[in-house]
Each structure stands twice: as structure tokens, then as C-alpha cells.
């Protein structure tokens, strides 16, 4: 058996890092499905994987060491992907938040400086119910959130294109796709639609509550009750009559 030697102790390869849990099947409403992001992932980062399995197993994550994309960008990870969603609609607008989990967020190869185990990144589709299309798109970027008008966003049909991207010497976030992103860099070289689970699509509320209350350290999931309204408030496009707290 091959293994990893650490201070003279041989750790079996199977125990060196835990594989992510299995994903949940697609379970989302028409609105959430229609305006979900079309995803790609730059080569210097991880693929989005499940944060929780059907049996309630939480993702263990990875130490931010080794290669920046080490142990988290295999085709098997891409095949076992997941997106979580939560929406709020009022005053003619719907904000649909899409949350993606990554096993680590590493800034520099070989060392953990500036990085952390676990990463949560979010994309918000702002849908005008009159036009029935995404008019604005927001992405979380480190500790901030940036909102873009439709004119700056590329689409795959009704789906805004975003790319999980390493920000220079810093860590990762979702950026808008651009003309250099064709074809996508993932193993299949196409835009990806991980199985989507919306707020009302969970197999049980207890499984949803387990994820929403889990501690991911420096990474925070922003579709739980404690952070959802604040995220919408910070991301809301100026001038639209949407109430993030309604």
C-alpha cells in the first residue's frame, strides 16, 4: 500500500485526506433552475463538491497545502458536484442565491499562508419578474460582494456564466466569464450545471439545518437564516424596489 510519510509515520493513502461526501440529486424549482449559473473552474483551484452527504456526513475539507489545486480538482470531483440555492421575491424582483462549497481555498503553493480549509462562494441572480431575465449578477469576492449589470454578463441561454478564479496572489472567488473562457477549462470543456438543491428541495429539514448550522471556520455559508438577509442587503442593486428583509 502506498502512503504518505509524516515524521516517520506512514499514513495510508486512503486516510491522507477524506473524499468529499456524495451529492444530493437535483431538486429545485423552475425559477432557481432557469437562472442558475453556468460554471467553469480555472485550473489553479478546486472543483465545487458537496458540503454534506445524503446521510448527513459533513465535508472534512482539505488543509491548504501542497498544490493549489491538489486533491480537489480530479474529474471524480467534477462528477460529484453540487450547488445549493435560496431565493427571496418581492416588489417585482427575485434574488436567487447560489452557494458553492470547495474543500480548500489556498493562496500559495506548498504553504497555508493566506489560505484556509473550506471555501464558500456565492452568486446571486437578480431576476426582474416583468422581463423574466437576470438583470444584475452579484458574486462574493473575499469579504465583499460585487454587483454587475446584465450588459457585463455573458450567458448560456438564461444562465449567467461565472468562473471560479484565483485572485492573483490571494485566494479564490467567482468572476464573470469573458471571451478568453471559451472553451471552459474543466475536464469536460463545457459549462457545468451541478445538481441544484433549493431551500425547499432538501430530503429533510433536519439535513438542511445540519448544513446551515455547521462550522466551516473562516468560510461561511450565506444562505442560512443568520446571513441571508445581510448578503442580499449588501448585494442589492441600487434603485430597485427590493426589500432584502421582507
Place the predicted regions along the sequence by residue.
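Secretory targeting and sorting signals
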Residues: 1-18
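A domain-level signal for the mature, folded cores of soluble proteins
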Residues: 17-121, 135-246
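Short beta-strand micro-motifs enriched in acidic
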Residues: 126-130
Amino acid at each position: 500500500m502506498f502512503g504518505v510519510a509524516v515524521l516517520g509515520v506512514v499514513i495510508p493513502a486512503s486516510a491522507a485526506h477524506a473524499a468529499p461526501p456524495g451529492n444530493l440529486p437535483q431538486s429545485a424549482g423552475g425559477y432557481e433552475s432557469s437562472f442558475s449559473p453556468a460554471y467553469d473552474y480555472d485550473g489553479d483551484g478546486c472543483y465545487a463538491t458537496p458540503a454534506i452527504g445524503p446521510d448527513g456526513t459533513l465535508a472534512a475539507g482539505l488543509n491548504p497545502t501542497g498544490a493549489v489545486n491538489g486533491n480537489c480538482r480530479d474529474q471524480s470531483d467534477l462528477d460529484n458536484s453540487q450547488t445549493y440555492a435560496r431565493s427571496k421575491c418581492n416588489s417585482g424582483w427575485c434574488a436567487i442565491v447560489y452557494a458553492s462549497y470547495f474543500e480548500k481555498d489556498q493562496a500559495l503553493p506548498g504553504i497555508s499562508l493566506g489560505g484556509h480549509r473550506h471555501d464558500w462562494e456565492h452568486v446571486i441572480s437578480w431576476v426582474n419578474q416583468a422581463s423574466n431575465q437576470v438583470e444584475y449578477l452579484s458574486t462574493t469576492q473575499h469579504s465583499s460582494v460585487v454587483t454587475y449589470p446584465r450588459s457585463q454578463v455573458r450567458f448560456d441561454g438564461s444562465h449567467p456564466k461565472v468562473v471560479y478564479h484565483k485572485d492573483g496572489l490571494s485566494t479564490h472567488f467567482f468572476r464573470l466569464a469573458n471571451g478568453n473562457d471559451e472553451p471552459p477549462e474543466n475536464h469536460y470543456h463545457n459549462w457545468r450545471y451541478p445538481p441544484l438543491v433549493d431551500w425547499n428541495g432538501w430530503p429533510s429539514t433536519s439535513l438542511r439545518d445540519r448544513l446551515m448550522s455547521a462550522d466551516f471556520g473562516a468560510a461561511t455559508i450565506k444562505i442560512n437564516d443568520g446571513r441571508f438577509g445581510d448578503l442580499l442587503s449588501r448585494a442589492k442593486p441600487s434603485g430597485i424596489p427590493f426589500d432584502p428583509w421582507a
